[in-house]
Amino acid sequence: MMKPVLTTIAVAALAACGDREVVVGEDYQRVLDPLAREIDKLDVLFVIDTSGSMQPEQQALVDAAGTRLFSQLEQDLGGLPDLHVAVITTDVVIARPGVPGCLSEDLRDNGRFRVGLDTIGCPGIDGRYLIDEDDGVGGRRRNYQGTLAEAFTCAASLEIGSGCGFEHPLEAARRAFDGRHPDQLDFLRSEAMLLVVFVTDEDDCSASSGELFADPTAGLDSPLGPRTSFRCFEFGVVCDGDQPRVFGEKSGCRPRDDSPYLTPIESYRDFLAGLKPDPSLVMVTGMYAPPTPVVVGQEPTGVVRPDFPALQPTCVAPATGVEATPAIRLDALVQQFPSRFVFESMCESEMSQRLYRIARSTAGVMSRSPCLLGNVDITTTTERCRAFDVAPDGSQRVLSGCRTANEQGCFHVGPSQTCGYTPHGVAARYRGTLAAGHRLVVDCLAPVGR
């Protein structure tokens, strides 16, 4: 079972933590790891699902991005960062002709930056992605006409309904930067934060070959099973008991690392982390359904056949009514970026609220905010965390947790009004002054159930 990047402590390691009540052997996860310095450059890649069910969510995205993403970044950072913004779809060439809506030839998409509708484009945008950056003489260098919100609205207005129902968001993100599109490589700047935003109502189905989509007339007696999106779950995820076609609720579901058909999650984690010289400059966010509960039931009547197994929707998105199924692989990937991931459930808030929190979280990382990101909640306190004073050369010393309100030379974890944009509103601070160039790095035990 793959877990987020974390560490397991032994008894000896507890001595430096004093007498705090910590469960020996439990896993800590990094929740605060500030950049060495504040940065003002941001590369943003949107990976958008263009399957038919996503039309309301795509419209909500383009309607809200101007005020809830770009304007919020400008407000939080005291000015708009130097921006590169690109859009791709979840469609890639799957090397298997005849799959409705899916690419069998390298004609478009396949990791290519998209600028609006394929037949029209965006005449006001000069290039394959948006540029809005300081020109060095007090102004801005832009490659678009009108406002940034208007330009993004056009760029992100794609052919919804034309997309493949076997979504490949992770493979699409890789193909955007793996060298097959040389004109896109200048999008990435070594000194800029990279923010990857996945927007989809289904889990990742990034296949390692076209064999997953073979045998289009297969039934329940076929090893592959019916050619529906359930194949992505059956061969991309493993749950306790490993009987994917049996109806009912599943437990312990995680990416199937030994899948003969889907690419392992670690491959995408390593690729994305390697896009910047400093992996801490890579941030991954997602708008998708929570990975639980996982329930297998009947295909909706009239879609294929009611006796065929199907992954049941986890929830329905507010305002848009989009049904979303559990994104187990995608969630596992996002959580491989400790203190650099933001999960925004498609089920619990509207698009404008999701973009607001993503913008504020991104600005927080860029400005070295003390707000914790990751698997923490309002019950996370100093007693459930450990902290380090990390020097510029990477050496570190263990810090003790504060036991009283006035104690100095220690770290404290607790609620903070400045972190209200996070799901938990928790921050970590050092009481005292760290040496110049030193950083406060914090690990915490995950909440029960995560």
Where are the model-predicted features located?
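C-terminal motif of bacterial Sec signal peptides marking the signal peptidase cleavage site
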Residues: 14-16
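Sec-dependent signal peptide recognition
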Residues: 2-8, 329
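Divalent cation-coordinating acidic motifs and surrounding scaffolds
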Residues: 18-450
